[in-house]
């Protein structure tokens, strides 16, 4: 008599993709709350009267607390689990986002950014850990690309939403109303999120798919001191230290660049920002899809990931010419292409973490590499403020943006010549 395994007769449910959708919306809200300040910066600079250096310090305050938060929160999420960790994170960052409405001085905004950085630092460690728990290896790059694209959607929604609120109800209302979005998301997270084996909506076929190439999470998380003694953690950390600052630069200075270079005010700045981030969104999903597609073609993990990273590094190079273009839209297209290359790069950098390390360590690993990126962003923010105050020119900043990815890829390859030999 033939006994059929129940899961072999079933079509897998798609609960994991609903979880991915929740991560996407969390990341979208994360970036809306982060972007409000940058969009309002030209107006606030006129109203409050801070200098380029002071603006750089305010941005640095966020980067500093974000870096510190990533180092601490990764271990906390490994301890609490993804569900509780995300709850704590989004409550803190939503309250901090609304607290910006109380600020009246550069110091006040700096304190609000410090609190926001601590809260928002939980998003990516919790999201990547969730991906490692809910997706088989072959789907992780695509799932990461999808949720990571929320960063671009958030940056698209913010220029649509913030000017309307600010022009009609004042800039304080823009911070308060966008800050409330996190509590709406929290309702769905509480109802839908659980571990795969505990979820009542998942069937045996999907659970088998998820568990096909993942280790059982029975051991305690590895010590961070043991993790940082490996070359593979430094490959990702250095890669993010060199390239995350480029993303932070565009997140916080693109509205000001458009304002100072092309004279765009709050009521006109939305469309160019939306176009740039729409292009960037294609890069996030496309970069994740391309890497997963290479694996499905039978490529090794090493070839799939590094080829995708190389393509992204090449596509970012044309951004070099953006600062010298007199016409608005060609510059926006080039910047959008560079941002798309970054988001494709970023999706694969996070996927490398799931390639290299077991899911029990994912919060710690993502926290550490995220901290490295935030430290790079902190240094970039401070240097950008001083550079713009001294020269008023963005040229050198675009040169840096165009060159960092290729250099970072060389370092990654030297540290980890064969990803397949290092995979978890």
Residue ranges and their predicted role:
Residues 18-52, 250-255:
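Extracytoplasmic
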Residues 91-104, 310-326:
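C-terminal ends and interior cores of transmembrane alpha-helices
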Residues 68-107:
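Conserved MFS/SLC helix-loop-helix module at the cytosolic interface between two early adjacent transmembrane helices
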Residues 49, 81, 102-108, 119, ...:
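Helix-breaking motifs and short loop linkers at transmembrane-helix boundaries and internal kinks
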Residues 147-200:
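Helix-loop-helix hairpin linking two adjacent transmembrane segments in secondary transporters
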Residues 37-38, 230-287, 342-346, 350, ...:
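Extracytoplasmic gate region of multi-pass secondary transporters
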Residues 35, 63-71, 155-156, 277-281, ...:
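Residue-level signature of mid-helix packing/kink "hotspots" within the transmembrane helices
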Residues 112-152:
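Cytoplasmic helix-loop-helix junction between adjacent transmembrane helices
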């Amino acid at each position: 008599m033939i006994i059929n395994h129940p899961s072999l007769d079933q079509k897998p449910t798609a609960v994991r993709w609903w979880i991915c959708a929740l991560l996407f919306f969390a990341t979208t809200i994360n970036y809306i709350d982060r972007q409000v300040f940058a969009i309002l910066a030209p107006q606030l600079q006129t109203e409050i009267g801070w200098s380029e250096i002071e603006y750089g310090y305010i941005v640095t305050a966020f980067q500093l607390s974000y870096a510190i938060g990533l180092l601490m929160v990764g271990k906390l999420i490994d301890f609490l689990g993804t569900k509780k960790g995300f709850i704590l994170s989004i409550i803190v960052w939503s309250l901090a986002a609304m607290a910006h409405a109380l600020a009246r001085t550069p110091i006040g905004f700096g304190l609000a950014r410090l609190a926001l950085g601590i809260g928002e630092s939980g998003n990516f460690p919790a999201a990547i850990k969730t991906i490692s728990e809910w997706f088989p290896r072959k789907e992780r790059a695509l799932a990461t690309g999808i949720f990571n694209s929320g960063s671009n959607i958030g940056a698209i929604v913010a220029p649509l939403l913030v000017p309307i609120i600010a022009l009609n109800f004042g800039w304080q209302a823009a911070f308060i109303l966008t800050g409330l979005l996190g509590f709406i998301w929290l309702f769905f997270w509480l109802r839908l999120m659980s571990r795969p084996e505990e979820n009542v909506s998942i069937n045996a076929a999907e659970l088998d798919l998820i568990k096909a190439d993942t280790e059982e999470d029975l051991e305690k998380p590895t010590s961070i001191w043991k993790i940082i003694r490996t070359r593979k953690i430094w490959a990702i950390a250095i890669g993010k230290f060199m390239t995350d600052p480029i993303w932070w630069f565009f997140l916080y200075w693109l509205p000001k660049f458009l304002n100072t270079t092309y004279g765009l005010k709050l009521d006109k700045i939305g469309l160019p920002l939306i176009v740039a981030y729409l292009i960037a969104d294609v890069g996030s999903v496309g970069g994740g899809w391309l890497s997963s597609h290479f694996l499905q073609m039978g490529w090794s993990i090493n070839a799939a990931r590094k080829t995708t990273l190389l393509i992204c590094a090449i596509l970012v190079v044309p951004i070099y010419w953006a600062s010298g273009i007199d016409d608005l839209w060609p510059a926006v297209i080039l910047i959008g292409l560079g941002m798309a290359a970054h988001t494709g790069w970023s999706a694969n950098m996070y996927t490398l973490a799931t390639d290299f390390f077991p899911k029990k360590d994912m919060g710690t690993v993502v926290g550490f590499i995220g901290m490295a990126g935030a430290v790079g962003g902190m240094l970039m923010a401070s240097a950008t403020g001083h550079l713009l105050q001294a020269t008023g020119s963005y040229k050198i900043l675009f040169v840096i943006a165009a060159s960092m990815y290729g250099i970072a890829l060389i370092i990654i390859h030297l540290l980890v010549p064969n990803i397949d030999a290092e995979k978890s």
